[in-house]
């Protein structure tokens, strides 16, 4: 699905990513871990060009989306993104949040009865997504009335509404109260079971062990280790990874 070749990113004279190479295949669950400031969130934001790479290639569905001549919005439709702070529109209801992108894309150029019919279909699909997370009774409320866990689950199904080829998660549980983390991770596990391709920046080591098929360790803008969860956590090779795990696995 995604082939990253020699990806580089600088902010001014500060090099944040120093030549990242990774292939993400269909159905992969890739968990990205690393210390604060290591470049892991920048790496994720470069994957859908929310941050413009300074160098390298990002081949997504056979197109180099890092090429400035490519219309990135066409490709972003196929790449969901879930943020740490939910990024729901507070002036729109839960249902409107989920319908917004599909209506914008699928109803473009439609008028009258055809548009009405398409909006009806999108509404039904959005309600089915809410039913999946047992939140159909929240369709007409505004995000400010929801708990953090509910907001994040809405944000995840909002990304599903576009039928993406891959979903990127940027620390999806780090802004949540501890008792709400489980409901979000359970939803992510169910997506993994269905074969959704996911790239996840997270501090949830238990989730990485249980759900990932690959874990990568980024530090100082480079991938220092990439392995199966079993190898990664039980037999780490890189000294910096060993040191990192000794601090986070208590």
Language-model segments: which ranges?
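ABC family nucleotide-binding domain
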Residues: 1-229
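C-terminal boundary and immediately downstream tail of ABC-type ATPase nucleotide-binding domains
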Residues: 219, 224-226, 230-250
